[in-house]
């Protein structure tokens, strides 16, 4: 059931503002959503998307002067229970499930069925299991109501959240970056469920940074910028240029444009031969040249991150040789690699890269603080100047260098981590999912930095699951499948770098590769 021009809005958020101490997170924002509509919400990190949805879900109270209407009736969302009773459900990036409880217990949480006395009676688990069988079957769940949630995959746990929303008779479902932890196949299955819910009349508010998802799913797209409403586009009016301009307030032309000179094939920086580990990487070889951006693509589980960590010395290798320039490089630890001029930006910046409870200044300086030591004491002034220079050079949006990194947006956190690596003056830089979880503006700035590094003669390896990104920034692309290099595109092969060619190599579909040419 898609929206018709004559249908009445299901949700109207009018003149919504929210002020925190010294920060106005939302300023007079309005949003209208119809039944049977997938309405995407876009904006850079910090634009106000999450704050607006937390007001809708009852987690925050809006400032005075705004109102929320459902089916034309004004409602007072004074907490999460009020939102649930009004038919609003939210599925956050961090799933809100109890792993030690069953599927049925998670679906009924806060609404448990009891024997006898509804308040004090014992929980009737059998009745709850029976009560959610229909919704699980309706959503095609491959598990039963008595399954422990902790035994399910992330995609299956997400399905439990959707089942809970449907079971509570939610009419408005908010999904915040739901595909971030999913494989391509799991993402397609999720899209099928979202379309099914739309056909059943639910209003879906879909938050994502991924343009391909926005194009594939959206009936309309609304954009926020700096806490204000910018505008709404109908599906037929969508274009990357218009969306990006609305989000960042400026035109980002040549989003993936290669702005560095062709690399020098005679200047080899990194040579890897027959490298392997005990489990995931099975004899991989590659070359990286000065000024080259080398992309590594492949499906989830193909071994891309494992290969990068082997080269970096973060994991032990069972065989293989690595050379930096003309010298053998036997890194036994990341410290060895950094000292030799090879650095690695992890895909998991929060757990493996940043010190979230430390300042921006300390995060930037931590890899090179030994340079500032004088008679055993750190030169704090030099470290502070280095941090200020990095903030200016990488356009890190932060009030000052003393702010904790944990308080920054994803894009600014990524730039802090990248600036730390660049302070080591690397010859080779490995970037693992460098734009994951960052907004459009930050992506553009990261691409600019990659181009600048290549122009300066640094060799850059980019591992990414976003095919347009790989195609746009890389001079050559290696495609991995099941721990091996399945093929090479671009460069001396003269094989065009296309999505079809990458997918064909990643899946082993040689017939599809032939069709691409």
Swiss-Prot record:
Residues 11-251, 263-507 form the ABC transporter domain. Its main location: membrane. It is a peripheral membrane protein. GO terms for molecular function: ABC-type D-ribose transporter activity; ATP binding; ATP hydrolysis activity. It is found in: Cell inner membrane. GO terms for cellular component: plasma membrane. It holds the Pfam family ABC_tran. Gene3D superfamilies: P-loop containing nucleotide triphosphate hydrolases (3.40.50.300). ATP binds at residues 43-50. It is an enzyme of class 7 (translocase). It catalyses: D-ribose(out) + ATP + H2O = D-ribose(in) + ADP + phosphate + H(+). Its EC number is 7.5.2.7. InterPro entries: AAA+_ATPase (IPR003593), ABC_carbohydrate_import_ATPase (IPR050107), ABC_transporter-like_ATP-bd (IPR003439), ABC_transporter-like_CS (IPR017871), P-loop_NTPase (IPR027417). Keywords: ATP-binding, Cell inner membrane, Cell membrane, Membrane, Nucleotide-binding, Repeat, Sugar transport, Translocase, Transport. Part of the ABC transporter complex RbsABC involved in ribose import. Responsible for energy coupling to the transport system. Belongs to the ABC transporter superfamily. Ribose importer (TC 3.A.1.2.1) family. The complex is composed of an ATP-binding protein (RbsA), two transmembrane proteins (RbsC) and a solute-binding protein (RbsB). This is Ribose import ATP-binding protein RbsA 1. The gene is rbsA1.
């Amino acid at each position: 059931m898609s929206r018709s021009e004559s249908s009445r809005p299901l949700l109207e958020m009018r003149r919504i503002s929210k002020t925190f101490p010294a920060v106005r997170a939302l300023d007079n924002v309005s949003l209208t959503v119809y039944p049977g509509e997938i309405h995407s919400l876009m904006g850079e990190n910090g634009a106000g998307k999450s704050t607006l949805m937390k007001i809708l879900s009852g987690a925050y109270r809006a400032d005075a002067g705004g109102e929320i209407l459902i089916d034309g009736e004004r409602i007072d969302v004074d907490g999460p229970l009020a939102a649930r009773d009004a038919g609003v459900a939210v599925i956050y990036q961090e799933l809100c499930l109890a792993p030690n409880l069953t599927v049925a217990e998670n679906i009924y949480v806060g609404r448990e069925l009891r024997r006898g006395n509804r308040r004090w009676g014992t929980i009737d688990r059998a009745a709850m299991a029976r009560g959610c069988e229909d919704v699980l079957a309706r959503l095609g769940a491959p598990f039963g109501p008595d399954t422990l949630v902790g035994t399910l995959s992330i995609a299956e746990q997400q399905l439990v959240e959707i089942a809970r929303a449907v079971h509570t008779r939610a009419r408005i479902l908010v999904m915040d970056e739901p595909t971030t932890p999913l494989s391509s196949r799991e993402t397609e299955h999720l899209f099928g469920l979202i379309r099914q819910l739309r056909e059943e009349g639910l209003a879906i508010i879909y938050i994502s940074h991924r343009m391909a998802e926005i194009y594939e799913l959206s009936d309309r797209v609304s954009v926020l910028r700096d806490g204000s409403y910018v505008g709404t586009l109908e599906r037929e009016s969508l274009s990357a240029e218009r969306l990006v301009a609305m989000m960042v307030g400026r035109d980002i032309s040549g989003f993936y444009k290669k702005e560095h000179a062709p690399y020098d094939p005679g200047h080899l920086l990194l040579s890897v031969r027959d490298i392997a580990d005990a489990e995931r990487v099975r004899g991989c070889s590659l070359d990286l040249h000065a000024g080259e951006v080398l992309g590594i693509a492949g499906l989830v589980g193909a071994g891309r991150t494992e290969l990068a960590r082997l080269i970096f010395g973060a994991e032990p290798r069972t065989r293989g040789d690595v050379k930096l320039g003309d010298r053998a490089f036997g890194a036994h630890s990341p410290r060895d690699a950094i000292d030799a001029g090879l650095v690695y930006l992890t895909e998991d910046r929060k757990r493996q890269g940043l010190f979230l409870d430390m300042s921006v200044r300390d995060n930037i300086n931590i890899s090179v603080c030994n340079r500032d030591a004088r008679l055993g004491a750190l030169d704090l002034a030099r470290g502070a100047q280095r941090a200020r220079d990095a903030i200016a050079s990488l356009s890190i949006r932060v009030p000052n260098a003393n702010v904790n990194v944990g308080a920054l947006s994803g894009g600014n956190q990524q730039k802090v981590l990248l600036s730390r690596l660049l302070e080591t003056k690397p010859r080779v830089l490995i970037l693992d999912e460098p734009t994951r979880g960052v907004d459009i503006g930050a992506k553009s700035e990261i691409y600019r930095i990659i181009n600048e590094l290549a122009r300066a003669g640094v060799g850059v390896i980019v591992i990414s699951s976003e095919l347009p990104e790989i195609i746009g920034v890389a001079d050559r692309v290696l495609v991995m499948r099941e721990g091996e290099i399945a093929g090479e595109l671009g460069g001396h092969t003269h094989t065009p770098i296309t999505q079809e060619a990458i997918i064909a190599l990643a899946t082993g579909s040689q017939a599809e590769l032939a069709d691409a040419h």
